């Protein structure tokens, strides 16, 4: 009668850890996908906004040409143009922040893959031991049968 492998519980724990690590990779990859989509969206938004801003500045200057404005209104006009430039900086900062998020997510994916590799190695060690143990047990049983 075969006895049960004494490290079965440890093997179960190792297999569970390996599966958990694999799920961690899936979660990290999903986060990375989402971060990349967000980055592309931000970039497209920035480019569209820049195009609109250029057209808006041109439209504002065209409306200004040939008119007499008091200094106060000219100052307000210049402040409006400056606000557009500030808005561009804020949108560019959002793109940079999204790019940083992508880099962070890429690092998390790498770390998660490293955890899977480590967990797989640990599981493989126990599986190799179990295979050797099974062979030894089989040989002992064959010897016991041969003696009887």
Indicate where each model-derived feature is located.
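Charge-rich amphipathic alpha-helical interaction elements
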Residues: 1-148
